[in-house]
Amino acid sequence: MNCEREQLRGNQEAAAAPDTMAQPYASAQFAPPQNGIPAEYTAPHPHPAPEYTGQTTVPEHTLNLYPPAQTHSEQSPADTSAQTVSGTATQTDDAAPTDGQPQTQPSENTENKSQPKRLHVSNIPFRFRDPDLRQMFGQFGKILDVEIIFNERGSKGFGFVTFENSADADRAREKLHGTVVEGRKIEVNNATARVMTNKKTVNPYTNGWKLNPVVGAVYSPEFYAGTVLLCQANQEGSSMYSAPSSLVYTSAMPGFPYPAATAAAAYRGAHLRGRGRTVYNTFRAAAPPPPIPAYGGVVYQDGFYGADIYGGYAAYRYAQPTPATAAAYSDSYGRVYAADPYHHALAPAPTYGVGAMNAFAPLTDAKTRSHADDVGLVLSSLQASIYRGGYNRFAPY
């Protein structure tokens, strides 16, 4: 019996040895303590006291079970270090542009403020000159240039002031804009560059007709060529100027392409319109049809006005004298007034050589010769007014 007890005791002592060895399948290992949770939490123990039941700490910190081959202590340092490194990297990347932006913006502002700036000053007193404008704006900063715009009559009431520093220019604009100087409210604005456009050259001849800017009348090409056909004012009851029955012009304006012609007095629907009008048409380049020997007072063909004169005529034609060789011209853009009310006050200007433009050769008695002298005076006055003051030099702009 004693032997059996000793044998059993030895078996019990031998069996106790495996308890000290590592078990192949350990119990569940919990994650390392986080956020102040005590380390004893990993050991199996009862739940916390009832007063902590309201706090849901377990869902916030989920517990992951790891097999015994892997221990959480081996991976957590690498994971946490990777997270911290990546977090610091993103912070530095985000902070880089914020650090660089304040450095570039002040440099740009300083460059803009150091550039010169030009101001446009309008509605300034007309007696102001450059020193006056410089004195007005000089209190705000250094001025590079002052310019007041003038024409032949004096100041135009506006000018330009160029500051060396744009900040000074802005301050001057804010202070002086809208201020009253000698009863005039001046305006100060930033000067802008003017867009230069090429002005179209206006042809003085509009379909062969030239506009006189002084008198405001319209003259035909025959007037410049010396071939002027005056209306029969005697038939209309006008006694201001009366043309002779036939006039011969022996000279024309040099360089003008239209030929001179032996002229007859022209009559063109004056009884219908209240004034005499000469008859031309440029749209008829070919020779006109043969004349109809009717209505002897009418000289040139024109379908439009022939309808007014003839009324029921089937073919709107009227007589044309055979010796007339002048080309046909149009008055569709204006009217010819043989007697302008301003011409009696205009004397012929000898410097323009208008006396050589028309030489009259009277063919009849002394009465016709006197008529020719009157007509020559009128023509000289008309032609002198054409070249007198073609442009107004007192235009404001």
Swiss-Prot record:
Region span, Disordered: 1-121
Tissue: Predominantly expressed in muscle and brain.
One cellular component term from this protein's GO annotations in UniProt: nucleus
Biased amino acid composition, Polar residues: 70-87, 100-113
Example GO biological process: RNA splicing
Domain (RRM) ranges: 117-193
Site (Interaction with RNA): 118, 126-127, 151, 156, 160, 184, 194
Location in or out of the cell: Nucleus; Cytoplasm
Keywords: Cytoplasm, Methylation, mRNA processing, mRNA splicing, Nucleus, RNA-binding
Impact upon substituting residue 126 to Y: No effect on RNA-binding
Annotated positions of the Omega-N-methylarginine modification: 388
CDD domains linked to this entry: RRM_FOX1_like
Principal subcellular localization: nucleus
Gene Ontology molecular function terms on file: mRNA binding; RNA binding
PANTHER family, sorted: ATAXIN 2-BINDING PROTEIN 1-RELATED, RNA BINDING PROTEIN FOX-1 HOMOLOG 1
Role description: RNA-binding protein that regulates alternative splicing events by binding to 5'-UGCAUGU-3' elements. Regulates alternative splicing of tissue-specific exons and of differentially spliced exons during erythropoiesis.
Binding partners and assembly: Binds to the C-terminus of ATXN2.
Protein name per the record: RNA binding protein fox-1 homolog 1
High-level lineage: Eukaryota, Metazoa, Chordata, Craniata, Vertebrata
